[in-house]
């Protein structure tokens, strides 16, 4: 999903 992608991108 979009949220999961963003979190992974931030390294969270």
Swiss-Prot record:
Subcellular location: Secreted
Keyword vocabulary terms for this entry: Secreted
Origin superkingdom: Eukaryota
Keyword field contains Secreted: yes
Tissue and organ distribution: Expressed by the skin glands.
GO cellular component: extracellular region
Name of the protein: Dynastin-7
Organism: Limnodynastes salmini
């Amino acid at each position: 999903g979009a949220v999961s992608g963003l979190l992974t991108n931030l390294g969270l």
